Design a protein with these regions (language model features):
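Conserved SAM-binding loop
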Residues: 108-109
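Short pre-catalytic strand/loop immediately N-terminal to key active-site residues, enriched for Gly-Thr
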Residues: 105
């Protein structure tokens, strides 16, 4: 994440400001964010206990595959930041905002959520913990709900978004949803 911070400081300080906002107004989004905080604690703290007490025996090959998935997800995250200067943490439509159809947005409508799902479900395995992997799967419906909620706002308030949904059929997972 330090790389993305340096990238944003140099390339797009306005996007960095958008990514650090926390003034979400929608109740459902506040609940999703609160659940995400609990999730992050589980995913990053539980593997330490798992290692300490030897609860999981994740094979090295699986750790390496998970590391590669985390790396690919991080690259996708950077590509999203590069393509979309309006990628705010808060669900909103800003003045002058346009629909982005290039880069990862040509494949799915919410590539940042896809990158987070890949990164955060692979991280427990990369850290050698089956016990943290299981609860990490809860992130998938959380981010799917966030994407669906975000789409309601974008369809209503962002010019051209409805046409974009007709061209780019998948929200999160190419070929699936």
């Amino acid at each position: 994440m330090m790389i993305s911070f340096v990238y944003l400081v140099k390339r797009d300080p306005a996007l960095l400001e958008r990514r650090t906002r926390t003034n979400e107004t929608r109740t459902v989004q506040k609940w999703i964010i609160a659940a995400s905080v609990i999730y992050f604690l589980i995913v990053f703290v539980l593997p330490g206990f798992d290692k300490r007490f030897g609860w999981s025996a994740v094979p090295v090959w699986l750790v390496i595959v998970a590391d590669l998935v985390v790396l690919a997800a991080f690259i996708l995250y950077i590509l999203v930041l590069h393509a979309n200067t309006y990628a705010s943490r808060v669900i909103e439509v800003e003045q002058g905002q346009q629909v982005i159809t290039r880069g990862p947005y040509a494949l799915v409508r919410h590539p940042m959520y896809l990158s987070m799902i890949l990164m955060m479900t692979a991280t427990p395995l990369a850290l050698g913990s089956y016990w943290a992997f299981v609860p990490s799967l809860a992130l998938i419906p959380l981010l799917a709900a966030r994407a669906k909620n975000e789409e309601e706002l974008l369809l209503k308030d962002l010019k051209g978004y409805r046409e974009y949904t007709q061209k780019t059929h998948y929200r999160l997972f190419p070929g699936i949803w």
